[in-house]
């Protein structure tokens, strides 16, 4: 059901950035306990830069392999972090964040960006959230 809501707001004729802007709002509403939801996009140096998001101010640049987002980019895999304070090298963009999930957006075997969600609750994100967000990432990769 949630994936149908995502599909319903995708505009195949709109630029990627426009779709990501709307998706950041929808995902914030659909994934319970989320206080920050956004996208980081990969630049030509294989680092991440801030894309559309909902929530408080965010880090604008994340280096490859750094923090949860950079590690997801490096490993090309989704990461669920139940307690960000225990994650080696965590980048604290907000002191409110206690748990995080990051899902890479992979197109033609290359990560083009990541979906990043943060919660004030510890252990907020589940395997179901991961599966849902991986479906969303697949939709984005095919835009």
Say what each PLM segment does:
Residues 99-106:
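A short, aliphatic-rich beta-strand micro-motif
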Residues 106-119:
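Sensory-domain boundary capping and coupling elements
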Residues 7-9, 119-143:
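Juxtadomain coupling helices with adjacent low-complexity linkers
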Residues 42-92:
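Regulatory sensory and allosteric helical modules in signal-transduction proteins
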Residues 36, 102, 114:
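Short hydrophobic/aromatic beta-strand element in the GNAT-like acyltransferase core
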Residues 1-53, 143:
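Intrinsically disordered, low-complexity terminal regulatory regions
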Residues 31, 92-97:
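Short loop/turn motifs at secondary-structure junctions and domain boundaries
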């Amino acid at each position: 059901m949630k994936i149908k809501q995502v599909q319903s707001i995708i505009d195949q004729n709109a630029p990627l950035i426009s779709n990501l802007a709307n998706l950041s709002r929808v995902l914030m509403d659909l994934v319970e306990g989320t206080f920050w939801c956004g996208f980081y996009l990969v630049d030509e140096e294989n680092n991440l830069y801030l894309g559309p998001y909902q929530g408080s101010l965010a880090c604008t640049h994340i280096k490859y392999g750094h923090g949860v987002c950079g590690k997801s980019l490096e490993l090309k895999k989704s990461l669920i972090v139940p307690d960000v304070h225990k994650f080696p090298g965590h980048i604290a963009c907000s002191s409110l964040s206690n748990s995080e999930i990051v899902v890479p957006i992979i197109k033609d075997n290359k990560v083009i960006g990541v979906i990043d969600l943060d919660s004030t609750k510890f252990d907020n994100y589940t395997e179901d959230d991961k599966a849902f967000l991986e479906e969303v990432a697949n939709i984005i990769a095919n835009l």
